Amino acid sequence: SPFGMVSSFFYGTIQAALFTLLAVYATSMNFTIFEISVVTFLLAISGAISQFPVGKISDIYDRRKVIVFSTFGASIFALLTIIVSRQMYLPGDLATSKTWFYIFLILFSFCSLPMFSLILAHTNDYIPKEKFVAAGAGLQFVFGLGAMSGPFLCSVFMDIVGSNGFFIFLFFFHGII
C-alpha cells in the first residue's frame, strides 16, 4: 500500500531521531545523568506497554482512524512537551515541574511508538496472506531508509531552532504521516 510505504519511511525518520537524540536533547535542557536515564526508560517502557492496548483498539476500529488518532495525539503531546520544557527553568514559583515533562513524554510515547505495528497491520489488511512476509520486509526496508535520515535531519533542525527543535521535528513529522 502506498500509505504503508510513505508512512513507514517517515516513521523510520521519527523513531531513529527519537532514540538517538533524546539523550542529546535532555542534556541540552540541563537534565542530570539520572534524569536522562529516567527519560529514556520512560520512553521505552511506555512505548512497550502501549503496544497491546493500541493494537487491540486497531482490531476493533478502522486502523486508518487509529493511525490518525495516534499521530494527532503524538503531535499534541510533542507540542505540550515543548511548552512545559520552555517553562521548566523559569525562576521560583513560575517554574513548571519536570513531572509534567515526564507525563507528556509518556503520553507522546504511548501514541507514537506503536505506529510501525499499526502501519504494518494496515498494509496487511489490503494484501493476501501469502504476501505478509514480503510486505513486512518491504516496509522494514523503507523504515530503515527513513531511519538513516532521521538523526541527521533532526540534529540540523536542532542546530537551527535550538533544543526544542527536537520536539518540533517530531511534531512536524507526525503531522506528515
What kind of region is each of these model predictions?
Residues 33, 127-139:
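Loop-to-transmembrane helix entry/capping segments in MFS-fold secondary transporters
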Residues 38-47, 139, 143:
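Transmembrane alpha-helical segments of major facilitator superfamily
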Residues 4-7, 15-39:
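Helix-loop boundary and gating motifs at the non-cytosolic
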Residues 50-62, 158-159:
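Helix-to-loop junctions at the C-terminal end of transmembrane segments
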Residues 113-127:
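Intracellular juxtamembrane helix-capping segments at the cytosolic ends
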Residues 73-93:
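C-terminal ends and interior cores of transmembrane alpha-helices
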Residues 65-80, 171:
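Structural signature of the two symmetry-related core transmembrane helices
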Residues 156-174:
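A membrane-interface helix-boundary motif in multi-pass transporters
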